Regions:
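N-terminal secretory signal peptides that target proteins for export/translocation
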Residues: 1-18
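Bacterial N-terminal signal peptides
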Residues: 21-33
Length: 194
């Protein structure tokens, strides 16, 4: 009949797409409902490999700093690590990020301080991998690292004096002297949130 509009139904292809999407949504909802246990929350991801026996850091391209999410493999001279008592190892883009995690493992590593086993850094002048508890730490020099003004690890008094002559040093401290309360005074960096 002229002037009368025929009823229009959606094309069959569109009906199939809507029907398929509804079925897929229902299947996904059922899978979530029957999944065993809670879905794990996002958090810090340990390195793909642990520290080597001599403390060497086998950093992979996928490893991310748990403090700032930068890629430690891009900064081999400044890379650092913390091994935990359960064998997990976290790699950091810089000694500063490692020190933040050492002071606040509950925030940055999702574990208590009792789980921290071995902090490792690369000594600035020699490149030697060392325990971070055995080095002198320098702040306030002219060295710039991945996160800005660097916190620099030095292995002994001779390296400290040579570094100081070349780069300056506002503060020198040991890891066991560093606390949340004196962080800003010793490092010259803003205090991490607690």
């Amino acid at each position: 009949m002229p002037g009368r509009r025929p009823e229009v139904s959606p094309p069959p292809k569109m009906l199939g797409t809507v029907h398929g999407a509804l079925c897929l949504s229902l299947v996904m909802l059922l899978l979530v409902a029957v999944a065993p246990g809670p879905v794990p929350a996002a958090g810090p991801v340990p390195g793909r490999q642990g520290l080597g026996p001599e403390g060497d850091m086998p950093i992979s391209p996928e490893d991310r700093c748990p403090v700032c999410a930068m890629l430690p493999i891009r900064y081999p001279r400044f890379a650092a690590a913390i091994a935990l008592t359960d064998g997990r190892t976290y790699y950091f883009c810089s000694p500063g990020c490692m020190l933040n995690a050492w002071l606040h493992p509950d925030i940055f590593l999702g574990c208590p301080a009792a789980d921290l086993k071995r902090p490792v850094v690369r000594e600035y002048l020699s490149g030697e991998v060392m325990d971070a508890r055995e080095v002198f730490w320098v702040s306030g020099s002219d060295v710039v690292g991945p996160m800005g003004p660097a916190l620099v690890p030095l292995k002994d008094q001779a390296h400290l004096e040579a570094f100081r002559r070349r780069h300056g040093a506002r503060k020198v401290f040991r890891l066991d002297e560093l606390t949340h309360d004196n962080w800003q005074t010793l490092t010259g960096k803003q205090r991490p949130s607690s």
